[in-house]
From Swiss-Prot:
One of its GO terms (biological process) is L-arginine biosynthetic process. PROSITE patterns: FUMARATE_LYASES. It comes from Maridesulfovibrio salexigens (strain ATCC 14822 / DSM 2638 / NCIMB 8403 / VKM B-1763) (Desulfovibrio salexigens). It catalyses: 2-(N(omega)-L-arginino)succinate = fumarate + L-arginine. It is an enzyme of class 4 (lyase). Its main location: cytoplasm. This is Argininosuccinate lyase. Its EC number is 4.3.2.1. Pathway: Amino-acid biosynthesis; L-arginine biosynthesis; L-arginine from L-ornithine and carbamoyl phosphate: step 3/3. It comes from the Bacteria. The gene is argH. The keyword Signal does not apply. It is found in: Cytoplasm.
Length: 460
């Protein structure tokens, strides 16, 4: 048997060292050791229940695998690159511990269904961690909204001042985005929660296996329907990574806003010292490095996703060695997404706001212009005409470096005789927000309802 490989019976020549270095995966797939051992223990128990192994043999295997787990977690386990992957490393060490019965563990199983099971279990564990982290993040944004219902700031389109909104409404927009991300994570969990054990290499096996038993021992909800599909697709990984990419997209958007808001020209937020860095030459600097890095890491997560999609796009059924390239992109995506969600929640909890600067910004950019147009519509003027009248008033005020609310009634009447004293109630920024009564708007009733709904959801 060449190289003493577990698969070496068919080979006479030794594997070239360069090939071993090029093809090994143990340097990174050892991250799946918990899942691999759990999957092997479930497989052994199932084999015993089906009469393929004796109960005594299964018990020996399970206890031997427990010892392997202890050795790995204590740092005593020696990973050997020449063994190719974690499966061979673990099985080889198991056989050293328990003797010839170790060779029976792989009965009715291929590394193809073995690694598919390992990876599904790993992705599921990661998604559960994302789900928990997102819940804390949603709670952080909801808490900020709850504490800032009365604070107003400009709402923007094209990054130009548009209409006044409450800071609570702004925070809630992100809470809803992350809640949708949470629901996508749950959907990913539901679809990934399928046990491939029993599919073997690609066509199933002649042994009387019972995949449902293996799934039960692993706590997985369902079993595969088609053995080719079970071992050859990584859609559950790509779907998780796409969801991670969307999470990072939403994080990157709030990061962009926080970077802008931290600029003294805006001054809307007080960057927590714990989440800022300084300059080696400019003593006054307080840089939003965490936000900038998170914005930058978003592209990295996109790259992880596209890397795996490109790997899988041309693969014929069933398993191909290309699929070894599925793990490192996901490991990187998982680490980046989870860390980003956690640190954003912590940063938002520590974030301070500058309501006075937000209020000052309301007076720049004619954010009450739409209110004047709506006021004129209420006086019976068609909206397009009201839009033109308001635009003319804005042009005059802008030329004189004034706000609409600074113009006298007589001046406003030169644009329309429909304008009366009550117009000044409409031009108030606070009134503009209070007058928003449509569902989902920035109006107080809508904001209160949103906060209540999110709080109720978080308690479930």
């Amino acid at each position: 048997m060449a190289d003493n490989k577990l698969w070496g019976g068919r080979f006479a020549a030794k594997t070239a060292q360069s090939v071993e270095d090029y093809t090994e995966s143990v340097s990174y797939d050892q991250n799946l050791y918990r899942e691999d051992i759990s999957g092997s223990q479930a497989h052994a128990k199932m084999l015993a229940e089906q009469g393929v192994l004796t109960a005594e043999e299964a018990e020996i295997l399970v206890k031997g695998l427990d010892q392997v787990l202890e050795e790995i977690e204590s740092g005593k386990f020696e990973w050997k690159k020449e063994m190719e992957d974690l499966h061979m490393n673990i099985e080889s060490r198991l056989t050293e511990i328990v003797g010839p019965v170790g060779g029976k563990l792989h009965t009715g199983r291929s590394r193809n269904d073995q690694v598919a099971t390992d990876f599904r279990l790993h992705v599921l564990r990661s998604l559960e961690a994302w789900k928990t982290a997102l819940e804390k993040l949603i709670a952080s944004f909801t808490a900020k909204a709850d504490a800032n219902r009365e604070v107003l700031l400009p709402g923007y389109t094209h990054l130009q001042p548009a209409q006044p909104v409450s800071l609570a409404h702004h925070m809630l927009a992100y809470a809803w985005m992350f809640k949708r991300d949470h629901s996508r994570v749950v959907d990913c969990i539901n679809r990934a929660n399928v046990c491939p054990l029993g599919a073997a290499a690609l066509a199933g096996t002649t042994y009387p296996l019972k995949p449902a038993t293996s799934a039960k021992y692993l706590g997985m909800e369902d079993t595969f329907r088609n053995s080719l599909d079970a071992v050859s697709d990584r859609d559950f990984v790509m779907e998780a990574m796409f969801t991670g990419s969307l999470i990072m997209t939403h994080l990157s958007r709030i990061c962009e806003e926080l970077i802008i808001w931290a600029n003294p020209c805006f001054g809307f937020i007080k960057l927590p010292d714990e989440f800022s860095t300084g300059s080696s030459i400019m003593p006054q600097k307080k840089n939003p490095d965490v936000c900038e890095l998170m914005r930058g890491k978003t592209g990295r997560v996109y790259g992880d996703l596209f890397s795996l999609m490109t790997t899988c796009k041309g693969l014929p059924l069933a398993y191909n060695r290309d699929m070894q390239e599925d793990k490192e992109p996901f490991f990187d995506c998982d680490k980046t997404v989870h860390a980003s969600v956690v640190i954003m929640a912590d940063m938002m909890d520590a974030m301070g706001f500058n309501p006075a600067n937000m209020e000052s910004a309301l007076k720049k950019g004619f954010l009450n212009a739409t209110e004047l147009a709506d006021y004129l519509v209420g006086k019976g003027i068609p909206f397009r005409e009201a839009h033109h009248i308001t635009g003319s008033a804005v042009a005059k005020a802008e030329a004189e470096s004034r706000g609409l609310e600074d113009m006298s009634l007589e001046e406003l009447k030169t644009f329309s005789d429909k304008i009366e004293e009550d117009v000044f109630e409409v031009l108030s920024y606070e009134a503009a927000v209070r007058r928003r009564v449509s569902p989902g708007s920035t109006g107080p009733e809508s904001v209160d309802s949103q906060i209540a709904e999110l709080k109720a959801w978080l308690k479930k």
